[in-house]
């Protein structure tokens, strides 16, 4: 292990994983302060649905909890608060602070411009809202269009304006943005847990079972394919198998460290993970909506088992949630509550993430005592699992259970807490999703696939020929017939 990992608290101020926890907890504590009469939320801006013919600042933006504020003031405060917090984190993580600040500001402006455009009624409004906005036509794409538009803009920058992309890379941190949003998503899950405790329990338990069954199939099949068909070395097959079977980049890096693989391997696999995650993000939400519009929880769970980065999974889950709810309202006459399909995807993904440390530990033991046959060369302990464990999961669980305990203290406390949290949670989480989409596009460079033909071919075959079909089958077995609450 390196020096950074010699203490349990190492990295708490220097890693994106931990800073996702700190930023999420800061926002959660701002919400909790409402219980003592402090109003520290409500300043967050959020876009509103609007039409081209009636464009105005007041029409496209609004304050999430302070209606007396001008929307421009809410947007300015939103920028100042998040700029201060992210720059503090960037300084602590030893980023180039000046470059991060400039890049963050550019990303923030682009994100909000795209978000506002994506909320134009011709793009977003459902068929039931046409009369409300005076529309004669509309695409009824829902909020998912904003995410897709952000991704497309990012891809254009990442592949056609590469100097700009390289400059923005210091601020384009999709994994950090999405992990921060997921930590705060814990409060939304807390609300859902109180509203539908039985359903949450069933979803969590079936999610654990589905994840375990799927993973026990994924890794050995992909590893065997890599070794016997593609004739990869043991370390290459192991790193790629973990990357595509567990959770992408984190698993590839953890596995490489555990088995002491060649340094280039996790880098190659990470590139493949990011690029293929982009394809999954674009294809799978619409595909699942089309093939099984009446199985929302199956689709969400299958997405969580298939998409291999936290950022892309959360982003794809948000898009799937929007697409399936819009489709159900338009074609089935059912209005599902927001967030439950996304939660099915994230819950499954989080169980997979929690397995990283355990699997890295198992592989380390196998490599030391079986593959390398050099006992005593490496000392494996519980601290290894701790340092591999995704810390944002701890933040997510802490916020989730803390909200439940605080809200359970009385109906008045629950109402106060919910009002204060809702003023920040939804807009903040969605803004982080938007930042994730545009950042994924910016860091995705298709030209980097050159020279990785064998690994790329194996990754594609394993993903679409093994992982996706098995994931959907397992999700179908464990989640078939489960439905989100109806409004």
Swiss-Prot record:
It comes from the Bacteria. InterPro entries: UPF0324_pro. Its main location: membrane. It is a multi-pass membrane protein. It is found in: Cell membrane. Keywords: Cell membrane, Membrane, Transmembrane, Transmembrane helix. Pfam families: Cons_hypoth698. The keyword Magnesium does not apply. GO terms for cellular component: plasma membrane. The chain crosses the membrane at residues 19-38, 71-93, 100-119, 139-161, 181-200, 204-226, 269-291, 350-369, 389-411, 426-443, 456-478. Belongs to the UPF0324 family. This is UPF0324 membrane protein NE0724. The keyword Zinc-finger does not apply.
